[in-house]
Amino acid sequence: MGKKKSKNQLNTGGVPNGVHNTKKEAALPPLGNKLGSASFTAINTLTKPALFSFYDDDITKNEGNVYDKALLSNASQLEMVPPSATARHERSLYAKIINTIAAFFILFIAGILFPMISECLFDNDQLAKGDIVSFLKHGIEIKNKIVAEPDMVPDWAVFGTEGVIFGSIVPFIDSFVRYQHQPKTRSSVYKNTLGSFIRCANTLLGLIFGIRKLEWSSSLQAAGAWSLLNIVLWLFFDGTLTVFFPGLVIGALSAFTCSQCFSQLSLALYFIDFYFFGFLMFSKLGRYLFN
């Protein structure tokens, strides 16, 4: 500690008699427009001790430099903020082509597996085994009409093409509504991951198992419960309107193409529920692969 100055060297204001109104505090170095003089004054008042003027100049000069350097260091750290996570380097054309081919191939394989899963959906009342896959078989009927030799094109190729179409609809819509340019929050990035797609697929398998094994009073009760659950699952897994409205349209088309759905409301709800959630699953896979 420095030696204290004698009382006869201080006036009533705590300033030495010989340098009253002549000694000025050294001005803090400017830090740009982000920090104004008011901020420096406030920080200076809070950090420097109240009895600052009682010490010798050699002590106060060194302490002032320490405080000023600390302020400069904090300001430099504020200016060195890393760029936003949304700023990505543009991929080369070759990388984009490889990514697109891989995405189409994976969606094609998923389209082949999807009818196999749908054949496992049935209950013990009105929904028989294989009824729900009738909507996907319309693609085979279209193939038989437009292809000169239908036997040359296998049925699994039709199902794979349908998988590519279902998985590409939402990424195609996103390119128009500029979904990829919206702020990438942690929740949105979390929802478009491979792990999220796997959880969605496991949920579909759990729903199919629940419809088959649980004791329902009627098919309408099971289909209605699935309809209410679909809203919660959509909010949990995705929550975007670009999936909700196209999913409803595809579900309604699947129910409209089934002749039995006109007389049985439970079958219509089954078709809407299954293909809405299936479209949600393909949309998540497509977003993950293309983005």
From Swiss-Prot:
GO molecular function: unfolded protein binding
Residues with the Phosphoserine modification: S39, S76
Family annotation (InterPro entries): INSIG_fam (IPR025929)
Residues that span the membrane, as ranges: 97-117, 157-177, 231-251, 262-282
Membrane topology recorded in Swiss-Prot or TrEMBL: Multi-pass membrane protein
Protein name per the record: Protein NSG1
Pfam families: INSIG
Primary localization: endoplasmic reticulum
GO BP: sterol biosynthetic process
Family: Belongs to the INSIG family.
Record-linked PANTHER family: INSULIN-INDUCED GENE 1, PROTEIN NSG1-RELATED
Residues on Cytoplasmic side: 1-96, 178-230, 283-291
Keyword GTP-binding: no
Keyword tags: Endoplasmic reticulum, Membrane, Phosphoprotein, Transmembrane, Transmembrane helix
Perinuclear space topological domain: 118-156, 252-261
Subcellular location as annotated: Endoplasmic reticulum membrane
